[in-house]
Amino acid sequence: MASRRGHTPAEVATAVHRLGGTCTWRELRRAVPWRLIARAVDAGLVLRPGNGVYTLPSADDGRVAARRLTGVVSHRSAALYWGWKVKTVPALPHVTIPPNRKLRDSAKGVATTHRRTLGPNDVHESRVTTPVRTVVDCCLDLPFDEALSVVDSALRAGLPRRSLLTAASALGPRNRVKVLQVVRLGSAKAANPFESVLRSIALGMEGTTWDPQHRIRYDDFYARVDLADEALGIVLEADSFEFHGERAAMSRDCERYDELVARGWLVLRFTWEQVMLRPEWVAGVIERTVRRRRVERGLMTDLQRSQAAA
């Protein structure tokens, strides 16, 4: 049944998915009308495993699949188990099994399987990879943007970076480099996977430095933005405010962006669909904006000028 404004409880499940598969009431309230949240829980569209915490019904599928395959919940499914946000909630749970394990035909399609030898210190008693092992596996096996989302979320949840660096140092040279690349770029300041994925795209721009949740201060104005390169004066915003419960909230957003532009900042705003589904386009827009700014500020080298003119 839809609300008077056309909203339905199904939107709550969509919001939880976009918020990384797990979220707080406060995060969810920013995305959907509060009246829909309880209705979505009652309908079984989302679960509330703890006070003020919401997940999707598929959250426990990993342990069911792990028991069936005599494996261990891992990767994105393990990240969700530890309460971390992920870029994409997996359609099938992730389970790690021994390299020489043979699966019966009836077990195929139950999970996305990974083959790896895990030590006793890699597995929690609940048959889920430990937090550190979970991050390492994600860095090794997932695309950069998905791995960065997990690393950011793990750091945000309090997992010490030094524990991840120590684990990476014990790996072989090739795997060590791969894990360290992501762990060193991780930041606890990123609010959610939406921002993490946007940052992963921006990090591909050579010679840029993007600070998450950057604070911009003037004598008469203050703003905290999702990403900023101070030297270039460019702001990137992950525009996730889907539901304005109050017109005042939308007005504050508009005022903030207008003040930034008036002070010389270039502000780029991207929607969830653009960042998650059209990353090449997002990268192109950022690249053209960076090139323009370098020309304006005389920051281009002779090589960059010739490339820009080509």
Language model segments and positions:
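Short gly/ser-rich loop at a beta-strand->alpha-helix junction or flexible surface loop bordering the NTP-binding
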Residues: 1-176, 291-310
